[in-house]
Amino acid sequence: MPTIQQLIRSERSKVQKKTKSPALKQCPQRRGVCTRVYTTTPKKPNSALRKVARVRLTSGFEVTAYIPGIGHNLQEHSVVLIRGGRVKDLPGVRYHIVRGTLDATGVKDRKQGRSKYGTKREKAKK
């Protein structure tokens, strides 16, 4: 604990909060252009081919973003919307692509949790 004299000499410094998604620059989402679309493998206990894209954002950052859902139509020069949210078993992937906006189509044949994958409601069959 500091003495009164030490506090007079220099006041207590505020603790700076470090953001988990700096490329968004305090915005909820950011637009960007895909520079590379590829698959990568997850960390040790898991095994898969995860779909990711390298995206150049309007904020000037180039980030790696995860493409959620089964199947996608993204390729180089696709314009996408990025939101925050990391993928735990992919190191360095701290952003998600928003499905159903701009060039990223929604997931086909999705029945549950549709809002997270940009899928419209199916018409009721008679």
Swiss-Prot record:
Region of interest: Disordered: 1-28, 104-126
Residue ranges with Basic residues bias: 113-126
rRNA-binding in keyword set: yes
Alphabetical UniProt keywords: Methylation, Ribonucleoprotein, Ribosomal protein, RNA-binding, rRNA-binding, tRNA-binding
Domain of life the protein comes from: Bacteria
InterPro entries: NA-bd_OB-fold (IPR012340), Ribosomal_uS12 (IPR006032), Ribosomal_uS12_bac (IPR005679)
Primary role: With S4 and S5 plays an important role in translational accuracy.
Database matches in HAMAP family: Ribosomal_uS12_B (MF_00403_B)
Residues the record lists as 3-methylthioaspartic acid modifications: 89
Subunit structure: Part of the 30S ribosomal subunit. Contacts proteins S8 and S17. May interact with IF1 in the 30S initiation complex.
GO cellular component: ribosome; small ribosomal subunit
Record family assignment: Belongs to the universal ribosomal protein uS12 family.
GO biological process per UniProt: translation
Gene Ontology MF term list: rRNA binding; structural constituent of ribosome; tRNA binding
Record's protein name: Small ribosomal subunit protein uS12
Gene expressing this chain: rpsL
